[in-house]
Amino acid sequence: MGRGCAGRRLLLRALPLSVSEPSLSRSRPASPPKVLPQAVKCYKHFLESCLENGDGVGEALACNSIGVDYQLMGEAYVKQAIQYHTKHLEVADVPGKYIAHVNLGLCYAALAMPEEAVANHQHALRYAIRMCSLAGESLACGNLGLIASAGEGDIPTAKACAERQLQLARTLNDNRGKGDAYRQLGVLSNIQGAHDEAVHYFEQAMQLAQQEGDEHVSNSARCCIGVAKGNASFDDYISGMVAHAADATAGEHH
């Protein structure tokens, strides 16, 4: 079921360096923030009608739409979003199940439940591979990488995910996907102390953003370049101070 609405689904992706714009998979454009509660109410009426008439396609569409709007309404509504994305998962076709798992992964990440988030993004990845969807696989890898890098993080896993995302984005000629991956690789390289490598990745991200006319991402990448260069200079300064202190100590012993 759900093949009729599968073609209408629009996949929206977030910037890895932004926590304010959730990466939501939705069946239609987002509702303006001020009308979200009313939109939820309308979609619930639509859902009731679908249930009464045995319309599985409409039921999947309604559950997805309600879940997404609850996510957009903020953290206080994430648990309600999970309820509807779970219902969506139960009635959806394979593309719909991919979408439901992506959204459930995002919800659990918002609730600081990384194990549940990872499990759902892994399911999404499996469905993407099953559908032979390189774009879906790229997004799933990106989401898994972001969770792996959170907090103390599993940096090797996060880097492997970002590298796979970059590979897929190149295959798809997806500039935004490449930019996402480059920024994530830059962040991870900076964490590992490979600041010159981080600068390279951020410069790639900035160039892609400029090509796409995305001033916000371009400026963000430019700031990250400055941070990475600053970290590199600081490391050089500390190394110089240590070497100077070692030379001074050696001189005192002579």
Residue ranges and their predicted role:
Residues 54-55, 95-96, 131-133, 172-174, ...:
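Boundary/linker segments of alpha-helical solenoid repeat arrays
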Residues 51-52, 71-72, 93-94, 129-130, ...:
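Helix-capping and short linker residues that terminate individual alpha-solenoid repeat units
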Residues 1, 11, 21-32, 57-74, ...:
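Conserved alpha-helical positions within TPR/SEL1-like repeat arrays
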Residues 34, 74-76, 112, 152-153, ...:
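Residue-level detector of the short coil/turn that links helix A to helix B
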Residues 150-153, 187-191, 225-241, 248:
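Alpha-helical linker/edge segments of TPR/alpha-solenoid repeat scaffolds
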Residues 45-52, 86-90, 123-130, 164-174, ...:
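Amphipathic alpha-helical segments of tetratricopeptide repeats
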